[in-house]
């Protein structure tokens, strides 16, 4: 390996020199005549007929292939596919070979007799290893041939598409081949592959003095007639027998046969037969869609842009600049080869390589002269996949590559003011050179600020990492342009804050940006008052719409939701209720929406908001406020949603409807509609008491003539009333609706007050009230049977006969005193169902009333009294007989005795009763005295137990004293002690012998008590545990 002597100041271009004989072990090397490298696969002609295949990537030993060539023939051209799978080798005398580099097998293409100077590889078969696919061959005579050959060397397609491509360029055809006619390069592109049957293709064909661009669509291959005319060029190319065989189908024939083919030619203006170098065409990049081309022609080196998808074919290749050839000692010195990188063009001369910048002024940034012992340059080939360029001499190869060639390009663009290009490069170098991006951004922003384009400057600075405070200072003025820039800056900064950790900063930017927008809108509204121009009004509307759309973005609306109280305060500070209403709607803050609409007295809009939402507490809260302004609409809304609305919660709303007729009538309609829902009412009538009270109030004030019918429809049973009786009575008294007051008195059981009130205006109503006492009597029996005493607490004491008579007598007194009509007074006896008697009426009848009028009444009274007296006499007689019978039984009981048999046993201990003191009960249960005390102890109170224990002690003490007196012979003392002993025994008998402990009242009263206490039960339960 020879030491690198390249003069490269900045190290952008690198070179590695390889001695093919020593380093790659090409032992049979005499002189390299041709070399090609693609995708790391090298194929070199090391002698006139010996080829060497070397895989750079694998490092395996090279393979040698000897072609069947006879002198003076030798290898002239080697064409490698981009993948390095296929090779076409052409000799000086027109012999051609296909080499499959995977197997290192070569095949002689005997039917192809011409010098192949260029190959256009098919991009559709870029990954195919078994076949080349349809490809285009360019010859030294200027003809184009389509070939398809497989890995076995079998040609499925071989057809000459045109004998002279110069015909397309309308150039003069010469019979003899010349350097100008030879095809130097073919670039094949597929433009559309959506429809595999109708693909669009482009081919760029290069000759020494011209470039030809053709675009066509696929068409079916033409039918070739057998035995046709064969051109002289074809004869020279050895293709004379192709027309006599069945012509295979071709793919690219339409380039040269279709009338729809588009073509464009670029020609050199300084063509000279003395220009002996072949023209070279190279493009970059070659793997993807090419963007730039370089063409070596007699005019110089043309460098320009490539756009294979251009609308006009003339715009496919557009020259950017041309580098003229240098004259040395009066003759041209064209390069041996050219190659393109991203930002440089490499020119290979016989003893040096130059790298020129593609940017003006196209300075030489790299020069690499090499030692003469390396030999002169024979060729300059590019490895399109590996992006290396190979220069070769007879025994050496030099491998050129790039090393971060964009490191100074961005500065060049920046100095020239091409900020977008500089920015594009700087972004790709952020990891390598982060300061580059910052410098470009600042320079571009400063340029925009100088141009007063603050919006563009803000967009640029938002991408910069310059401290936010220093950036903002550039826009903090009262200038409208700078304010627009500030808005843009805040907006762009906000777009970049997408992480969860940036929430605080995002909220701050949203609030700041909102404040700026509100200030702008406030200023525009102020100017609108002094400028009623419709265009300005439309501008204000558009600005408002723009602001609203902007703040509806997801990250912005989330911040507004979080800080909505601060947003509301900001809107209020700018008096912008429109925006506040917009934000409230955006975050679904219904309360604020309604508050703003109520403040603006937009009551119908408030109702619409409630209609669009589910029934909630807000509905019940707003109805009292709305019903004062739009009562009809509110009531219609309530009726339409009565299934979802709780009527009890509407009490405050309906209570307000007593103010005027306009509100009352809709409220009455709603309540009537609600009362018709019998199912709802029957579930819990008491819950609707307030609604019925409101209804009574409304009816009493605005529909008093219908109130009595409503009250009567609910009956007189107080427990069934849906309204509060006391409230109804007060309301009717307040509005002086006397028939309703009388009716309610009757419902309340205040018949005396009802009759007294009714006598003031209607005596018939008074009698009707008196008759209602009988209905109350029937209902009272039902009410007395209720289990809950509290439920009957409102019922007055049952009226006795005397009270009823007093009420009827008030009516009779009215007839006598007010109407002076004794006959009607006497008729009350029948009307009261004979509750009144003539005796009751006599005190109020005037003294001088004729007896004749009273005679039928008196006779009837005596008849009824006679029966009653006879019944009373019979009852007294029966009572006397029963009393006598009871007295006789009592006398007999005084002499009753009980006989005790010797076989009778104690009911407690089951032992014979005789032998010890015992007690006998009338139920024939016998107990020893001690057993009775034990049996009765559980029925006695603590006080009685203590008393009995004391008496037993006294009894034992007196008994011992009595025995002592007896032994002493003191008869008198013995009698005294005996009497005392009997008294104590009598006291004990009264305590324990009052009732039988087994069947007496005391035992019956203890029947619901447990046999065992909780402690006893637990103790007994433990005895059963194993």
Swiss-Prot record:
It is a peripheral membrane protein. The keyword Cell membrane does not apply. One of its GO terms (biological process) is vacuole fusion, non-autophagic. The keyword Transport applies. A zinc finger (RING-type) spans 906-932. In hermaphrodites, expressed in coelomocytes and gonadal sheath cells. Probable core component of at least two putative endosomal tethering complexes, the homotypic fusion and vacuole protein sorting (HOPS) complex and the class C core vacuole/endosome tethering (CORVET) complex. Their common core is composed of the class C Vps proteins vps-11, vps-16 and vps-18, which in HOPS further associates with vps-33.1, vps-39 and vps-41 and in CORVET with vps-8 and vps-33.2. It is found in: Cytoplasm; Late endosome membrane; Lysosome membrane; Early endosome. Pfam families: Pep3_Vps18. Changing residue 923 to A: Fails to rescue the defects in germ cell corpse clearance in the vps-18 (tm1125) deletion mutant. One of its GO terms (cellular component) is early endosome membrane. InterPro entries: Pep3_Vps18. Its main location: cytoplasm. Keywords: Autophagy, Coiled coil, Cytoplasm, Cytoplasmic vesicle, Endosome, Lysosome, Membrane, Metal-binding, Transport, Zinc, Zinc-finger. It comes from Caenorhabditis elegans. Disruption phenotype: Temperature-sensitive defects in the formation of gut granules during embryogenesis. At 15 degrees Celsius, pretzel-stage embryos have a reduced number of gut granules in intestinal cells, and at 22 degrees Celsius, pretzel-stage embryos completely lack gut granules in intestinal cells. At 25 degrees Celsius, many embryos arrest by the pre-bean stage before elongation, and 76% of these embryos contain gut granules irregularly distributed throughout the embryo. Defective apoptotic germ cell corpse digestion with delayed degradation of chromatin in late germ cell corpses. Residues 858-896 form a coiled coil. This is Vacuolar protein sorting-associated protein 18 homolog. GO terms for molecular function: protein-macromolecule adaptor activity; zinc ion binding. Plays a role in vesicle-mediated protein trafficking to lysosomal compartments including the endocytic membrane transport and autophagic pathways. Believed to act as a core component of the putative HOPS and CORVET endosomal tethering complexes which are proposed to be involved in the rab-5-to-rab-7 endosome conversion probably implicating sand-1, and via binding SNAREs and SNARE complexes to mediate tethering and docking events during SNARE-mediated membrane fusion.
